[in-house]
């Protein structure tokens, strides 16, 4: 099982569903290290604040997220079903979307996921999947996105959805 990449062993992708999440920019790179295993690294960034300065309407899902993980492909890398796990870190500030409550902090943990890669061309896949992640977070909760009134802070464990995946993948 060589650790050097060759043709059809390197891929880049972007998750279209992240763009729906208030414009999150994202990319993932992957390298196959065997017939059934690929190593992945991803980054997501959302720097946007909407209706800034309007306390009643301001909302944001600002974050920077980094993950490194592994995928197991029962049939062959970049084809068919897959299962994944990753270590993930996120610095975040989100609020004003469903309620005025806003939380910011740092989170780190492990994610577990699965999905299916549909080959639509020799070099292009359409990937579908879901993942969950859990870990530890340190946070501060504010009454609203712009008021600065702290209502809670601390550290706690969490378990929550991580990704809804509809990705376009290019395989070199």
Stretches with model-predicted labels:
Residues 1-9, 172:
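Cleavable N-terminal export/targeting peptides
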Residues 9-12, 51-53, 95-98, 147-153:
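Extracytoplasmic loops and strand-loop junctions of Gram-negative outer membrane beta-barrel proteins
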Residues 3-5, 30, 74-76, 157:
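Sterically constrained small-residue positions within well-ordered secondary structures
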Residues 121-172:
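Predominantly the C-terminal beta-signal and adjacent terminal strand-loop region
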Residues 31-128, 167-170:
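Gram-negative (and chloroplast) outer-membrane scaffold detector with strong preference
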Residues 8, 21-25, 60-66, 104-110, ...:
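Residues that define the transmembrane beta-barrel architecture of outer-membrane proteins
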Residues 13-31, 46:
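Solvent-exposed loop/turn segments connecting transmembrane beta-strands
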Residues 8-9, 15-16, 102-103, 139-140:
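Short leucine-rich amphipathic alpha-helices used at interfaces
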């Amino acid at each position: 099982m060589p650790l050097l990449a060759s043709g059809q062993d390197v891929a880049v992708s972007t998750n279209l569903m992240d763009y729906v999440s208030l414009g999150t920019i994202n990319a993932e790179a992957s390298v196959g290290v065997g017939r059934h295993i690929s190593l992945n690294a991803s980054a997501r960034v959302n720097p946007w604040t909407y209706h800034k300065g309007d306390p009643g309407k301001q909302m944001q899902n600002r974050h920077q997220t980094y993950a490194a993980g592994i995928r197991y492909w029962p049939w062959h890398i970049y084809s068919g079903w897959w299962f994944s796990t990753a270590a993930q870190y996120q610095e975040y500030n989100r609020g004003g979307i469903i309620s005025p409550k806003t939380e910011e902090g740092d989170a780190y943990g492990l994610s577990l996921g699965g999905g299916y890669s549909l080959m639509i061309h020799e070099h292009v896949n359409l990937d579908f999947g879901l993942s969950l992640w859990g870990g530890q977070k340190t946070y501060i909760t504010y009454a609203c996105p712009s008021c600065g009134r702290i209502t809670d802070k601390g550290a706690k464990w969490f378990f929550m959805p991580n990704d809804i995946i509809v990705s376009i993948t290019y395989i070199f």
